A protein has these predicted regions:
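Short, charged/polar connector segments at secondary-structure boundaries
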Residues: 1-117, 121, 125-128, 132
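Glycine- and acidic-residue-rich phosphate-binding/metal-coordinating active-site segment common to enzymes
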Residues: 110-117, 121-164
Length: 164
């Protein structure tokens, strides 16, 4: 935080920087002609690939922010680094950033786990603000999905899709 800025100015500046980083990452991806490398993974797509329908609630635990790689339903609103990809997320993002900077306790995010990857169900803005401020872990309520085991070659893992 810059000491001479009031909190509202700081929050506005944080969001502006986060959006600028997201736009720069998108431009660089286009220049490198990467195929959708800057998008979050869609949980529905990955779940379908793995035929993972068996869900088991695992409780609340601490999860590494870097392990959160995708979203349930909002994968277009944030980029691969959970930077805000759309200006429309700004008001909520700023509200979460303000609470973070005040040291307010925020509720756990809700995540789905598939193999070693996590997908946000609820808490996209909290994950985004945490990533922006280099917070290493978040408290999360986790439900785990297990893929059906089929004969034949295994589908690509969610983690392997990250490397693509």
């Amino acid at each position: 935080m810059i000491p001479y800025m009031n909190l509202n100015e700081q929050v506005d500046a944080d969001f502006t920087r986060a959006r600028r980083r997201a736009r720069l990452r998108a431009v660089m991806a286009r220049i490198r002609r990467e195929h959708a490398p800057n998008q979050l993974l869609s949980f529905d797509d990955v779940r379908r690939e793995h035929a993972a329908n068996n869900r088991l609630y695992r409780g609340t635990r601490v999860v590494g922010v870097e392990e959160i790689v995708g979203s349930v339903g909002r994968w277009r609103d944030f980029d691969r680094s959970f930077l805000p990809a759309k200006a429309s997320v700004g008001q909520r993002w700023k509200r979460i950033d303000r609470a973070f900077q005040r040291g307010e306790e925020l509720p756990p995010v809700e995540l789905y786990k598939l193999e070693e990857a996590y997908f946000v169900v609820d808490g996209h803005h909290r994950v985004s603000v945490a990533r922006y401020h280099d917070v290493p872990t978040l408290e999360a309520a986790v439900a785990e999905f297990h893929p059906k085991r089929l004969a034949g070659p295994a589908p690509a893992t969610a983690k392997s899709r990250l490397a693509a």
